[in-house]
Amino acid sequence: MSRVANNPVQLPSGVQVDLKGSDLSVKGSKGAMSLSVHSSVAVVQEDNVLTFAAKDGAKSSKAMAGTVRSLVNNMVTGVSVGFEKKLQLVGVGYRTKVTGNVLNLTLGFSHPVDYVLPEGVTAETPTQTEIVLKCSDKQLLGQVAAEIRAFRPPEPYKGKGVRYADENVRRKEAKKK
């Protein structure tokens, strides 16, 4: 069984945590986030350390304590350091550029694809075939990256498409006569 909840969350300098009832809010240099803590989880703040425990001994409560601990740890990391994801465009003529909060993608369709970035997510294009997404919310960042990748997922024969920078695309051999 996982023991994630046993590890306390260290609060770096510059991060403030407010715990009011079951609502926990975290503020830092990169923004503010809030979370509604499950009723079966007890959160205790001592100095710069947050500890999590299940209120009862039920298996589901222990699991929820670990889940809440991971969510809060991601919030603390997000508001202090932030998260980033890199995407690569592989294919002839595939390119991208950022105009304001709109990502313009040319992915081999008969029309360009315009993706409006949600609030809190920023995009940079170091080259025409790379996208760097930055956000303080890990879940939102992953969702945005998955939506962009879904426009043209990498295909297994030539590897063309939008892929994560660390993604390994399994290649297939073409059918031979």
From Swiss-Prot:
InterPro entries: Ribosomal_uL6-like, Ribosomal_uL6-like_a/b-dom_sf, Ribosomal_uL6_a/b-dom, Ribosomal_uL6_bac-type, Ribosomal_uL6_CS
GO molecular function: rRNA binding; structural constituent of ribosome
Keyword terms: Ribonucleoprotein, Ribosomal protein, RNA-binding, rRNA-binding
Spans through the membrane: none
Pfam families for the chain: Ribosomal_L6
GO biological process, alphabetically ordered: cytoplasmic translation
Single GO cellular component term: cytosolic large ribosomal subunit
Role, per record: This protein binds to the 23S rRNA, and is important in its secondary structure. It is located near the subunit interface in the base of the L7/L12 stalk, and near the tRNA binding site of the peptidyltransferase center.
Binding partners and assembly: Part of the 50S ribosomal subunit.
Family matches, as NCBIfam families: L6_bact
This protein's name: Large ribosomal subunit protein uL6
Organism lineage: Bacteria, Pseudomonadati, Pseudomonadota, Gammaproteobacteria, Cellvibrionales
Gene that encodes the chain: rplF
